[in-house]
């Protein structure tokens, strides 16, 4: 659901990064996004 909302929003990449970071935990997309 979070991913769908992210794609609908302007910050899709940001939301996907946060979601992926929670799921994976190993990678930090938010750090790369800074």
UniProtKB/Swiss-Prot annotation:
Record keyword Ribonucleoprotein present: no
Keyword Disulfide bond: no
Key words, A-Z: Aminotransferase, Pyridoxal phosphate, Transferase
Molecular functions per Gene Ontology: L-aspartate:2-oxoglutarate aminotransferase activity
Class of the enzyme per the UniProt entry, highest EC level: transferase
Cofactor(s) this protein cannot do without: pyridoxal 5'-phosphate
EC number(s) stated in the UniProt entry for this protein: 2.6.1.1
Annotated catalysed reactions: L-aspartate + 2-oxoglutarate = oxaloacetate + L-glutamate
Superkingdom assignment: Eukaryota
Miscellaneous remark of the record: In eukaryotes there are cytoplasmic, mitochondrial and chloroplastic isozymes.
Similarity comment: family membership: Belongs to the class-I pyridoxal-phosphate-dependent aminotransferase family.
Job description of the protein: Important for the metabolism of amino acids and Krebs-cycle related organic acids. In plants, it is involved in nitrogen metabolism and in aspects of carbon and energy metabolism.
Subunit structure: Homodimer.
Protein name: Aspartate aminotransferase 2
